[in-house]
């Protein structure tokens, strides 16, 4: 029976009514109030007495009227029965056998249970000469009682109960009461006899077949069971099994294969126990070498170019601390121009970051936290490429002179008026009557050395002449070098100004024309008779345009000189 304090008033009223053999009746008298706040009135009739009470629900009204009835009722109340005492009651609802196993492991003494036969009944003889009333000879059977012997080290305990498990629990309770306050014995080196006794105790719960296999495994001997004979009628079979363990063999007979196998194992086990004991070999202690860390991320430059969120998480993992905690603080701005504020917390450090979306705000918050913790900023890969000067469109060597600080678009070379006039004057001084050379689209992809018919002079002798020609417009040394060939050709009559610039750049030792023309062809830039236009065309369109222009030049050879004068240099 549960504790009466935990019972509800209605339950106690039912017990009171059951004790007096009456039926309690609950009646709903009235229901008032609005729908969200109703009040219910309930009447309780218990015998000739009635009580009324109200509540916000029918159940609460019933409990209130039952509580009122318990306090005002004149009926005698039943005596509460004491709770049943559990013999095996222990804290934690742990069975005594489990608790004893833990204590025995601490003491280093195994707990071994052995069932015992029940005590014999006394020899009782009835008086058969009784002449009186009818003597009933069929007595009710005596309840069966189980007995168990418990051995813990050198201590023995006996338990009894209606079941085998109850007997084990009873013996375990006695052992706990006796051993709980005793000190834990110190482990002492055991001699051969005590070790043998312990082995015998452990082997008491093992079958003979298991013991044979264990001994054979320790001594590295093969084991085989074989049924060599089977005789008798079908309902009374007899089997003979032979067991061979190394050099030992034995036979066993029984009415089943299992029984014959067990008897054969028992016979050969007696022979195996006569063998000398094995030498004790100490097992070597396993030594686990601690692997060194192959990756050391202690460099100050580690993490450059990495995502700040991942970098901060790796830093916390390396510190073996809690991972960063990100919280969205606020969201402000217009619907299409949102601004998110994200906060990150690492230990006692707090940092915030803003961005047009949550991802960027979280990234900025992580970057701010890294700076706050003393780490360098996580620069992006594009910033690193810009710092090192790498560019996918330029594959040649880097120039050794600084770039001019102007706002002119890339790809257009602006000449001063004086230099331009001197270059035009030098073009007019070139002799006419030379053959014109045209470039086919196929020749556009050839190296710059194939565009000139004369042999390219050495850089040491031609570099000063090229520099003088580029700066002053005329150069006697350049004219002397150009007259060495059999048929000197003027620069404008044979090649375009862009090719002249490429030739001069090659003499100076850097590339300027070929790769730059390819780059601006991909971007849609081309040179058209004095005006530079930007198109969104591809490289194929530019090649087609150059091919058509070459065909037009072949059809109108007289316009070449005019085009050469009006053309501008495009890099």
UniProtKB/Swiss-Prot annotation:
GO CC annotations on file: axon; cytoplasmic stress granule; dendrite; dendrite cytoplasm; dendritic shaft; endoplasmic reticulum; glutamatergic synapse; microtubule
UniProt tissue specificity: Expressed in both somata and dendrites of hippocampal neurons.
GO molecular function, one term: ribosome binding
Subcellular location, record wording: Nucleus, Nucleolus; Nucleus; Cytoplasm; Endoplasmic reticulum
Compositionally biased tracts (Basic and acidic residues): 194-203
Phosphoserine sites (modified residues): 188, 395, 416, 426, 440, 456, 493
Keyword Membrane included in the entry's annotation: no
Renumbered residue ranges of the record's region Required for dendritic transport: 381-571
Pfam families (alphabetical): dsrm (PF00035), Staufen_C (PF16482)
Superkingdom: Eukaryota
Example GO biological process: protein localization to synapse
Cited InterPro entries: DRBM-containing_protein, dsRBD_dom, STAU2_DSRM_2, STAU2_DSRM_3, STAU2_DSRM_4, Staufen_C
Compositionally biased residues, Polar residues: 83-94, 552-562
Keywords assigned: Cytoplasm, Endoplasmic reticulum, Microtubule, Nucleus, Phosphoprotein, Repeat, RNA-binding, Transport
Region annotated Disordered, chain positions: 71-94, 178-203, 382-413, 546-571
Residue interval(s) of motif Nuclear localization signal 2: 373-412
Assembly and binders: Identified in a mRNP complex, at least composed of DHX9, DDX3X, ELAVL1, HNRNPU, IGF2BP1, ILF3, PABPC1, PCBP2, PTBP2, STAU1, STAU2, SYNCRIP and YBX1. Interacts with the exportin XPO5. This requires RNA and RAN bound to GTP. Interacts with microtubules. Isoform 2 and isoform 3 may also interact with ribosomes, and this association is independent of translation. Interacts with TRIM71 (via NHL repeats) in an RNA-dependent manner.
Protein name from the UniProt record: Double-stranded RNA-binding protein Staufen homolog 2
Organism of derivation: Rattus norvegicus
Designated gene of the protein: Stau2
């Amino acid at each position: 029976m549960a504790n009466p304090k935990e019972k509800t008033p209605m339950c106690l009223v039912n017990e009171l009514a059951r004790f007096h053999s009456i039926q309690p009746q609950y009646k709903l008298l009235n229901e008032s109030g609005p729908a969200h706040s109703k009040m219910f009135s309930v009447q309780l009739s218990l015998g000739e007495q009635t009580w009324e009470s109200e509540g916000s629900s029918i159940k609460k009204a019933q409990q209130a009227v039952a509580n009122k009835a318990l306090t005002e009722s004149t009926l005698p109340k039943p005596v509460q029965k004491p709770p049943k005492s559990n013999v095996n009651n222990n804290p934690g609802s742990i069975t005594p056998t489990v608790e004893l196993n833990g204590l025995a492991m601490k003491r280093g003494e195994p707990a071994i249970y052995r069932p015992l036969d029940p005590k014999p009944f006394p020899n009782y003889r009835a008086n058969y000469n009784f002449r009186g009333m009818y003597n009933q000879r069929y007595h009710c059977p005596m309840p069966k009682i189980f007995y168990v012997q418990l051995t813990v080290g050198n201590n023995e305990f006996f338990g009894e109960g209606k079941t085998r498990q109850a007997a084990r629990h009873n013996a375990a309770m006695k052992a706990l009461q006796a051993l709980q306050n005793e000190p834990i014995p110190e482990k002492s080196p055991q001699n051969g006899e005590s070790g043998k006794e312990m082995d015998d105790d452990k082997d008491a719960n093992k079958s003979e077949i298991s013991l044979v296999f264990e001994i054979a495994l320790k001594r590295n001997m093969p084991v085989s069971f074989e049924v060599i004979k089977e005789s008798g009628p079908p309902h009374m079979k007899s089997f003979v099994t032979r067991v061979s363990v190394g050099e030992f063999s034995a036979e066993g007979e029984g009415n089943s294969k299992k029984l014959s196998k067990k008897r054969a194992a028992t016979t050969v086990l007696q022979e195996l126990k006569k063998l000398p004991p094995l030498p004790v070999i100490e097992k070597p202690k396993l030594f686990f070498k601690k692997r060194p860390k192959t990756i050391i991320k202690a460099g100050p430059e580690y993490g450059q170019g990495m995502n700040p969120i991942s970098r901060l998480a790796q830093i916390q993992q390396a510190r073996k601390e809690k991972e960063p905690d990100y919280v969205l603080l606020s969201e402000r701005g217009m619907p299409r121009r949102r601004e998110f504020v994200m906060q990150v917390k690492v230990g006692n450090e707090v940092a915030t970051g803003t961005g047009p979306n949550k991802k960027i705000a979280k990234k900025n918050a992580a970057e701010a936290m890294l700076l706050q913790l003393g780490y360098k900023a996580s620069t992006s890969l594009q910033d690193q490429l810009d710092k090192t000067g790498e560019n996918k469109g330029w594959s040649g060597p880097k120039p050794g002179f600084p770039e001019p600080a102007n706002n002119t678009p890339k790809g257009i070379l602006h000449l001063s008026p004086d230099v331009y006039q001197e270059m035009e004057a030098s073009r007019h001084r070139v002799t006419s009557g030379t053959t014109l050379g045209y470039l086919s689209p196929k020749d556009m992809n050839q190296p710059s050395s194939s565009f000139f018919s004369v042999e390219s002079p050495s850089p040491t002798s031609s570099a000063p002449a090229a520099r003088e020609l580029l700066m002053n417009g005329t150069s006697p040394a350049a004219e002397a070098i150009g007259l060495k060939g059999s048929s000197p050709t003027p620069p404008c009559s044979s090649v375009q100004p862009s090719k002249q610039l490429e030739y001069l750049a090659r003499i100076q030792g850097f590339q300027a024309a070929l790769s730059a023309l390819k780059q601006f062809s991909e971007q849609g830039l081309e040179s058209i008779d004095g005006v530079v236009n930007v198109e969104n065309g591809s490289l194929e369109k530019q090649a087609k345009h150059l091919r058509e222009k070459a065909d037009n030049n072949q059809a109108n050879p007289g316009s070449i000189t005019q085009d050469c004068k009006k053309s501008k240099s495009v890099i």
